[in-house]
């Protein structure tokens, strides 16, 4: 399995002062970097400093319709890292030799994944295009490849994916509070980008006919996917949340003060450790796992793109469909004369309590809201516990046992009043 890291590998080669600001809101992170550039805080050349400040000005002039806060921060940060680690950023915009030095560093010394290195190459080319005011890329950078190495296999590995039954449910059982349960369930159900996950507020979540609807403002625009299996856990945290609609969703348990992005990642890792889940549990892997589950259940590429905020015809979405949708294999088997039937989707969504009509986790024996037992097995278990307790009571104190029997006769068959300890 891939190694675990609290800080995503995209930021691994950077110096501590850069890592510190990367966990903030992207708009705030941009302001911090600009202030430090203006104060000559960074150990970079004057030419590179001036170019980065010009980059910031040009992005602000083009406005949010062209560059979101995330994209603004993405370009400015990578430009700053190149200026610090290699230098010659300003020269590389106009000079092929200087540009080659930067690309060589990206390809050989910038110790990231193929995706990370691609991001740096694309960012470098885009920076050059923005600051030269041209219609296209300057000659010095136009040649820079924006793709992946020939031997790069971007297909998701099924063994890395987090499954609801084998991974998510044990993590939910290992959580110590309603916030962490909501975090685990929502991250898998919604599959948001890390930045989208961190920036959620209670006001982003509203009721929907099929569950809860979440409004996200991602890099491809606004979308509003629907939560299903995570609904009971998210509702419980919304009830327990100490703040209002505009406060951070992921806050401290007793105050609406935001917890850091690092703390959100730590919470996932801590829960996984307690549950014995050894797979990578970063927000990115929750996103990948969400996509893999939807693809495996026959969700179309168009719907997967809409749910995860990918552009139409996305190569990423098509990879998940190719790896996890077994429709092609079924058709080939059918062509060879086998009697093949499509598997029924795995049931992971919540069930509706017949008493209070709230959604409760499918795996629970009793409604988490009103205590109503939800299966014959659960009812029998409650009755068995009651009989055992009554027998013990008779042996210890016959008068108290008779009093208890009187109370039970008044309660009748309403075992929900006794269900509190059933799952303990």
Task: Describe the function of each predicted region.
Residues 2-13, 17, 21-28, 123-127, ...:
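Basic, alpha-helical nucleic-acid-contacting "clamp/cap" segments
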